[in-house]
């Protein structure tokens, strides 16, 4: 059986098990993301947890972080690679807490649809604000990322009113292999 097809079957079954209608996802044009193989450590995040990224992304993250630091801006990792199972458990916890499927999928991607699976997505913060809040857009770190992130291949995926129906996430950046 084709690996890609098997993964898609796993995604559909998991969505069904979680009570997430596939139409809610496909209507938002969310692509399926397979897991990164062999993500590498980028050290610990701001909470002391080991974080991982895809190899080239990790290299560009370190380079970007060093350049920001040289400009007096501190970029901190909050969350990098997340496995399919991690994302499933995240959704299960939110369902158990009483959140509706609609509420959850505007904030958290269902398993199989998270950019974090690729090892190329990174939630970024700075000591200037609490992590994963819209307040991040008011920081020097966000301003620096808006001006310089593309120099290292990073782009914010979920701007205001994005096509995927995801809340505005100024902290969520994805590496696209478009730098020399």
Describe these PLM feature segments.
Residues 1-80, 84-180:
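Extracytoplasmic cell-surface/polysaccharide-interacting catalytic and binding patches
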């Amino acid at each position: 059986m084709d690996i890609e097809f098997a993964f898609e079957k796993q995604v559909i079954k998991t969505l069904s098990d979680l009570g997430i209608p596939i139409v809610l996802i496909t209507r938002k044009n969310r692509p399926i993301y397979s897991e990164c193989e062999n993500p590498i450590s980028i050290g610990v995040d701001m909470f002391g947890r080991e974080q991982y990224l895809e190899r080239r992304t990790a290299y560009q993250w370190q380079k970007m972080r060093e350049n920001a630091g040289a400009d007096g801006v501190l970029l901190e990792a909050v969350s990098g690679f997340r496995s399919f199972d991690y994302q499933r458990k995240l959704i299960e916890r939110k369902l158990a807490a009483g959140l509706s499927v609609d509420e959850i999928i505007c904030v958290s991607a269902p398993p199989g649809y998270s950019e974090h699976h690729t090892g190329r997505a990174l939630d970024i913060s700075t000591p200037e604000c609490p992590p994963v809040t819209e307040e991040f857009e008011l920081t020097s770190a966000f301003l620096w990322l808006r001006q310089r992130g593309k120099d290292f291949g990073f782009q914010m995926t979920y701007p205001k009113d994005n096509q995927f129906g995801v809340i505005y996430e100024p902290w969520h950046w994805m590496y696209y292999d478009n730098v020399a």
